[in-house]
């Protein structure tokens, strides 16, 4: 990755990787050059002495006065020969197996020591003298590799290389562990798992528990690790440490059980966790049976610490390897009898050829120590792919392990073969993804990934084999492990064994069974009835010229409707016999592939050849016989200007682009004439290429000089893509590097390479271009090639001249051109076995029902082979779309049982139907209909009528229906014959939102060197929202200034947030192609048609489609507050973004699910007398709110940004049921809860019956009464007091005040209509006052005499009087009851007369006056004067 800002380092991800992750030193242990036998001399020239010195070592002396370097000696011991001699001698003496092993190992150590002592003595003597002078120190002699490590001055180094016994001197390079991408975190470490579920998935997957059940858990064996150390007292490891002393459990015996090459600590420890995790996978489990993390829990472990945080130096690793070969006591004496059975090596160097440790590995093998090496992991500098496997794992003598995941798929970080020795690598695979094991702190941690995690599984299974048979040799163990592995294949590696999985997944049970019970083999063919009636067809461009002494690679493309089973090439030289060779398929498959065969060692004057193509049905098609003119080898005087077809020039290799013709790019014109040979005449060369262009064979003159001269134009990525000229000496297999080319030439240049050193030899010369995974340029062009005996004065020195230095800063690890090796075509394996007539081949899984072990038949032939523990079993053959079949087999040790299967195709059924919108009933166009249980069935798509149809094999299925803008739906179906199913999808109604975490301003931009990497931002939906639809993304890119020239292509992906520690988890959508705007504006990527539903948290991801500088630069907000939501995707791994990068400028456009609106006003069951009403409520912001009155839409409005809405509508008379829905372009929500509003414009009917208007009273209270009538009556109030209403009447008792009282009766209904009645009543609580009442004195009256009765009082009173007779008068009661009126003679003056009659006789009769007013007040008063009637005085 690089940034726009030139003076800044690339992101800390790069530096993190360099410091602590997966770095492989590019110049570690450069191999010695191959020198032609004809030019070897006993005397050393100045040039040959300088060639002994590593260029990187020379550079280190420019920085330091002294440095540590390694001295490698020419003399090599032959430990294998010594071991064989020791075994032979032991057998003659009839020694026991244990004594034989001891003598064998001792002989190995002795042979190494003797060779080292003899060859090193003079140099050691010199170094010790320099030590005395202060010019050298830290001298350490090794025998496991014949070498010395010393810390000394440049002068000492230059003297050392002059010793003839010294082969070369090298820097003390650092090697790296293949660390997990999930480094140890004490806080996340896990506690013990109970024994009931204590076997880890990875241990179980390789059938280790089944091996334990047979009694093989590694007991009696010892495994070693060269790593970061081990926490010896970890509960899963403590009692398994060979130094553990049960009598003194806390004080182990560390001598010869532990060695610290880094810090010299006496007791085992692990400061980096890696070694503890690795050892746990080999042997770990707790005494109580919990935490069964190890494959060989009965084995013992020993360990060497050779790695620190910065890696392990060559000197420390040599010391470790020597100790493993024969652990040393306190005095430094080796003890081969204490050597382990297996050594695990989860470390390595870079890819390619580096043989520094090969002698060490050979020594281990000779001593019967099984050398397991992890294949290595991808990193920023090693992208993986073919040939990437690290050293020493890529040695032929190393047993390399690749990594798989829980699904037995190759881990994307696992490096691949072939090896530089053209061997399949790795040998085997084992689980290496999300591995749980022991870590320091006496706890456990899962989530560790890497081939480091895979290797210990294989080391432990090797220990199980040693327990089963301690006499097994390393070769035998390798054969058992590979032959019992479960073959694994995929689309990249369709055949087994292959350069991804090797021979497959290691299987502990089968491996042990092979030793104890032996293996049987079932083989046969899986087929389906049918005939292959079409013969194969082919294409071949004939060759007309070849050159004597060379070879002729020929290619042919063959095609067949069923299967091409073999392609053979027959040739003859002159009149000789025909020779037949089998061509290798180098690309394609059994239906159509390209095949290559190479005719070796061409002689004579004429070559004839023909092809034979065989297909599955037995057809054989033969080509014509092609005649080739054989020309003598070219030599001095040869010229080739490429204007005519260049005979004898052969192009081949990986991603080969070499072609002959007229260039339209690069130099655009030839150096002379019109035509050239170039790497793609119309564009850039391929990435990850290793392409060869070989000249005709050359015969170097026996004397004189020979120079290769040619015109060259090249534009190659600085420091990463190189052009080479290689020379293959006569009789050699390894090509020598003669010229190196890098960078860009400004025009055609003259190049010259001196071939004079190859006098008298038949040699070959190759032009080779090698590229990494990114940044391809215009390439290399060759013209006007000449072989001359005279120099043109432009000789290119090997690895020196011809290299054009790059400008600018290095952004990724440069390629070391010294390690380059030309490509060799790798054949694609395919079987050619006898076939059955009248059948067609079928790829099927063949399984052992009782154990589950399985393999696959070859797609081109139907043939399969399955090795298994001997016994009686049931084999099952099953293939997609076919009825499975079984048959009983009896597998016998070392015998082959035939079992053929002919399968019958299953019947198919048809599912059809219509998908509609659940809300509207309209058809849904573009809905996808999936068969969940059968991903091979292509999803059906609905047409514009919503109709779909799909075909699948009969059976029970779950059908999922999904469409953009809708919620998906599922249903179950029993598919048999034709089935029809209708589906209604609920629309997803959303409103737009934008999620952003940057501040909108871009301060920088980034671009990855390699395509396929990316950046992501974690998005979180708004509060209260748990679901949404992703409708688009906003991406901000830099302008055309960066990168230059740049590009616009990129991809968009979407991940959920279920990854470990918050990382992106599962990809839920994408990749989608997009085009970047490079003008400072945001680039909007429309995803609305994709139907991407997201949960609360999700990731929007930018994936770079093109390598830098042909990609856009994603902008970075470096000044805004860091959101902590930034992640980067590098080499298939997610990791948190570099905080220094700030916030990645990626935003998400989402539709939040539109909520069903809520009407807040008017309230339910409300009444109004208004014709219209304002409906208010809440809805999702920006949605259109539709208000309905009954079934009819009454109004429409848009919800505001805060979600509120309001709209006026017209009401109907009577009851109105109001609802609201919200809509977007995608559809409409459900209706809100109904609100009932009644429009009532009629007033209540009301009477006021009591009191009558104008009434008078003297009462303090009054009951007001009347009648009322209304359907929606709310209340009746009298003077504001709520009246009692019943049966159409109302009443209310009120208080009155003295004086005039107005009584108001109001009848109100629920709609607010009112009827009012009023009345007035006069109230007087005061009684009239009587004054001046006469007679004031007693009066004597006789019959006929009158008395005047008078008084004063208020006006308009009703005045009366009565004469109250004494009670003694019998008739008094009658008289007393009579009231006689008084007349108001003047306002307020009342008078009256009473005349005595003769009939009344009374003494003391009283006169009482009574006044009454209109209010009902009454006053009585008795006059002071009494009446004596008809009495005597």
Swiss-Prot record:
Q: State the signal peptide span.
A: 1-30
What is the recorded name of this protein? Bacillopeptidase F
GO cellular component annotations of the record: extracellular region
Name the catalytic site residues: 227 (charge relay system), 274 (charge relay system), 452 (charge relay system)
**What domain of life does the native source organism fall in?**
Bacteria
Q: Which residues form the propeptide?
A: 31-194, 756-1433
Domain Peptidase S8 residue range list: 200-512
Q: Which family does it belong to?
A: Belongs to the peptidase S8 family.
Tell me a Gene Ontology molecular-function term this record carries: serine-type endopeptidase activity
